[in-house]
């Protein structure tokens, strides 16, 4: 319960205001977390409305199962399964999809989950600790090339190659030192390599982000769920996405722009603009947390919310 109380939902009112356009509609919260957005959506829904939420984290599922509301249901799976999960429930179209991306405060603040370099814990980083390969397991087998690509591409870390070499060198010492399986040692290795310091940022920040994204397939799942949301939204339905770093936001921005623009046509072809299919989306807005919200919750500082609306049937 303590972790739930510590978690502050970012852009709560702004997200729900943008999402709920029909109180009797069917809505999807792709990232239940500790339920802040879901509870606020339920408060806006009419008796005939419905909310289906998703989360991979077993602790989030435990929290969701305590919500006693016939209009609400929870799916223990990645939001990448949204299309199939809704079809299995007889849902063909929805009035809105909300995605609050990234890792939640309770996950970061619990050393046992292995997301944070601020407190020592097992090197796990899985959103669902019961499924898939942990960070420690991946680090125990990844090549220098794979490590470099992940840390460079997902962490935007310019010392990626040097970090990768240091990790493989540490692995060669496993017989003597034991496996690399704690967040504290990973942070220490990265700190020895990254000599420059970004103001207010630990040198391990980018590497931890990169490994977490890789272990959880976050960017691949994001692309899948954006495509699913586009096909599921009814006319007038809203897609609301909150992201916390440039990689996520870039994917969301490009997706919305691509589907809010008319297809490019060779001007030499005898095709009139009115004969082209209308783009399915209209971009509504981009919003940021207020100064007051950032002051109350510093983790909101990097949040960006993008909203688009389905304008075609």
From Swiss-Prot:
What GO MF annotations does this protein's record show? rRNA (cytosine-N4-)-methyltransferase activity
Domain of life of the organism in this record?
Bacteria
Task: Name the Pfam families for this protein.
Answer: Methyltransf_5
Coiled-coil ranges from the UniProt annotation: none
Its GO CC terms are: cytoplasm
Recite the UniProt keywords alphabetically.
Cytoplasm, Methyltransferase, rRNA processing, S-adenosyl-L-methionine, Transferase
**Residues at which S-adenosyl-L-methionine binds:** 35-37, 55, 79, 100, 107
Tell me the function of this protein: Specifically methylates the N4 position of cytidine in position 1402 (C1402) of 16S rRNA.
| HAMAP family named in the record | 16SrRNA_methyltr_H
Annotated protein name in UniProt: Ribosomal RNA small subunit methyltransferase H
Q: Which organism is it from?
A: Burkholderia vietnamiensis (strain G4 / LMG 22486)
User: Which gene holds the coding sequence for this protein?
Assistant: rsmH
């Amino acid at each position: 319960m303590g972790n739930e109380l510590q978690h502050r939902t970012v852009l709560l009112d702004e997200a729900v205001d943008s999402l709920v356009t029909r109180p009797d509609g069917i809505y999807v919260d792709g990232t239940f977390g500790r339920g802040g957005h879901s509870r606020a959506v339920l408060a806006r829904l009419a008796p005939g409305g419905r909310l289906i939420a998703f989360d991979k984290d077993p602790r989030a599922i435990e929290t969701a199962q305590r919500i006693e509301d016939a209009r609400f249901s929870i799916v223990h799976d990645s939001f990448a399964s949204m299309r199939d999960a809704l079809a299995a429930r007889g849902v063909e179209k929805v009035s809105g999809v909300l995605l609050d991306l990234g890792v939640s405060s309770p996950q970061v603040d619990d050393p046992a989950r292995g997301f944070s370099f601020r407190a020592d814990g097992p090197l796990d980083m899985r959103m669902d600790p019961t499924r898939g390969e942990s960070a420690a397991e991946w680090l125990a087998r990844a090549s220098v090339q794979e490590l470099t690509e992940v840390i460079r591409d997902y962490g935007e870390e310019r010392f990626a190659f040097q970090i990768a070499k240091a990790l493989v060198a540490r692995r060669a010492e496993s017989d003597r030192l034991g496996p690399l399986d704690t967040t504290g040692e990973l942070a220490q290795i990265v700190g020895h390599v990254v000599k420059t310091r970004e103001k207010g940022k630990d040198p391990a920040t980018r590497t931890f982000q990169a490994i977490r994204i890789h272990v959880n397939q976050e960017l691949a799942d994001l692309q899948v769920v954006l495509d699913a949301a586009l096909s599921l939204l009814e006319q007038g339905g809203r897609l609301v996405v909150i992201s916390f770093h440039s990689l996520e936001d870039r994917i969301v921005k490009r997706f919305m722009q691509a589907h809010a623009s008319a297809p490019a046509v060779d001007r030499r072809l005898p095709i009139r603009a009115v004969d082209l299919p209308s783009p399915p989306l209209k971009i509504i807005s981009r919003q940021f947390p207020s100064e007051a919200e950032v002051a109350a919750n510093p983790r909101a500082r990097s949040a960006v919310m993008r909203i688009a609306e389905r304008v075609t049937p």
